[in-house]
UniProtKB/Swiss-Prot annotation:
Stored InterPro entries: PPIase_dom_sf, PPIase_FKBP_dom, Trig_fac, Trigger_fac_C, Trigger_fac_C_sf, Trigger_fac_ribosome-bd_bac, Trigger_fac_ribosome-bd_sf, Trigger_fact/SurA_dom_sf
Any GO molecular function: ribosome binding
GO CC annotations on file: cytoplasm
Protein name as catalogued: Trigger factor
Compartments in which it is found: Cytoplasm
Organism: Rhodopseudomonas palustris (strain ATCC BAA-98 / CGA009)
Gene Ontology BP terms: 'de novo' cotranslational protein folding; cell division; chaperone-mediated protein folding; protein transport; protein unfolding
Domain PPIase FKBP-type: start-end pairs: 171-256
Superkingdom of origin: Bacteria
Reactions catalysed, as given in the entry: [protein]-peptidylproline (omega=180) = [protein]-peptidylproline (omega=0)
Cystine connections: none
């Protein structure tokens, strides 16, 4: 067998491989000899079928299987001997001429093919002990706990019927039945019976709740609204609609006394236990936000410390995924690049930079994990599946069966676990200092991004 490197351009490699007909024939004979003891042919005792006869019956299919395996094994040998890590699947070009193919299958001609690959570059890892990371820490204040409990109380507020003839006000809960039309034609999902609406909750289409102010039980109004441009249903997005709406019940919010009795309605023993639960939940939220900030700092530091050319094919794959998502979002919201003060070309350039960073960081994290034998256990993946199932009550078995039969989905669960374990490994080596901050400071970056 002869292997000749024909392309060595950056991370791209291409090889021309020649496999002698004699080598292919020998492999085919090995396969036929193995087959001899397994097949049953009329007129022959088990294991006594002549090889020549087997070759006439099964020769072409065995030759095709043998060549396929031979090519895969040969390629694996080429890559491992040279220490290549492949960025993508190899591109193999086999002979196309029909007569040449026939001669190869019949053992009359050598097999010559080419294999093109893109390799992952060698990555020299930084000294993580030189990394400095600042960890924001927020103490849970009593005022934070009080605010959290007030939000819980508001969400569990009781309502009582208003007096006969009363008019709806902001904050009231109005039970309505409605029939929606667009250009006089009813549409799917436009009808509702006895639907409770809290005026001012912003849970309905913009403008719908405002037009309920002043309505009384038994009164019917025509409410005119326009579906948002980013509405989930593309057939309704941006369209004006009218809802013939009748109020069937009107209730006013009642003051909620936050005491032991209120805590018991939530399944807790006392107000003190409710405060403890609220404080623990806030502490977990703050810790999660702090973790995100620390992780961002660490990824930025890894990005700065590992500059290399990433495989173009991986960058292109990552970019295509992001660009499809951007286009889908713009179509659903009706926004244009001009609305974002940019152009399509400028946006593409920016997202290619993001794709390059993501690919490089992914390769760096993978290299760190591999060199330090960091692995995700089956138990960790199972716990992630269980957690995902808990988020879908009543469909737990469906979720479990989905992941059990879908390796790609399971890999998507495994990836963030692996990333977090690598991050934890680096943080163990890095110089991490804690800094006391306020809640507002902790969430400032997120608030700024939301505003933007």
């Amino acid at each position: 067998m002869q292997v000749k490197e024909t392309v060595a351009d950056g991370l791209k490699r291409e090889f021309q491989v020649n496999v002698p007909a004699a080598d292919i024939d020998a492999k085919i004979d090995e396969k036929l000899a193995d087959l001899k003891d397994k097949v049953r042919l009329n007129g022959f005792r088990p294991g006594k079928v002549p090889t020549a006869h087997l070759k006439r019956v099964y020769g072409r299919s065995v030759a095709a299987e043998t060549i396929d395996k031979l090519v895969r094994d040969t390629n694996d040998g080429i890559f491992s001997e040279r220490g290549f890590r492949l960025a993508t699947e190899p591109k193999i070009t086999m002979p196309q001429d029909q007569k040449e193919i026939e001669d190869i299958l019949e053992g009359k001609s050598d097999l010559t093919y080419t294999v093109a690959i893109e390799v992952v570059p060698a990555i020299e890892l930084a000294d993580f002990k030189s990394f400095s990371v600042e960890k924001p820490v927020v103490d849970v204040a009593d005022s934070d706990v009080d605010e959290a409990i007030k939000r819980i109380a508001d969400a569990n507020r009781a309502y009582a019927d208003k007096a006969e003839g009363a008019k709806a006000e902001t904050g009231d809960r109005v039970t309505v039945s409605f029939k929606g039309t667009i250009d006089g034609v009813a549409f799917d999902g436009g009808t509702g019976e006895d639907i409770p609406v809290v005026i001012g909750s912003a849970s309905f289409i913009p403008g719908f709740e405002d037009q309920l102010v002043g309505i009384a039980v038994g009164e019917t109004r025509t409410i005119k609204v326009t579906f948002p441009a980013n509405y989930a249903s593309e057939t309704l997005a941006g369209k004006p609609a009218e809802f013939e709406t009748t109020a069937t019940k009107l209730e006013a919010p009642q003051e909620t006394t936050i005491d032991d009795e209120f805590a018991k309605t939530l399944g807790l023993e006392s107000l003190d236990k409710l405060k403890e639960a609220a404080k623990a939940r806030l502490a977990a939220e703050y810790a999660g936000a702090s973790r995100l900030k620390v992780k961002r700092q660490l990824l930025d530091r890894l990005d700065e410390a590992h500059k290399f050319d990433a495989p173009p094919s991986l960058i292109e794959q990552e970019f295509e995924v992001m660009w499809r998502s951007i286009n889908a979002e713009m179509q659903s919201t009706g926004k244009t690049f001009a609305d974002e003060n940019t152009t399509e070309d400028a946006a593409k350039e920016e997202y290619r930079k993001i794709a390059d960073r993501r690919v490089r960081l992914g390769l760096v994290l993978s290299e760190i994990g591999e060199k330090n034998k960091i692995q995700v256990t089956d138990d960790e993946v199972s716990r992630a599946v269980i957690e995902r199932a808990r988020q879908m009550p009543g469909r737990e078995k469906e979720v479990w069966d989905f992941y059990r039969s879908n390796p790609e989905a399971l890999a998507q669960l495994r990836a963030p676990i692996y990333e977090d374990k690598v991050v934890d490994f680096i943080l163990e080596l890095a110089n991490v200092t804690e800094k006391k901050v306020t809640r507002e400071e902790l969430y400032k970056d997120e608030d700024d991004k939301t505003a933007a």
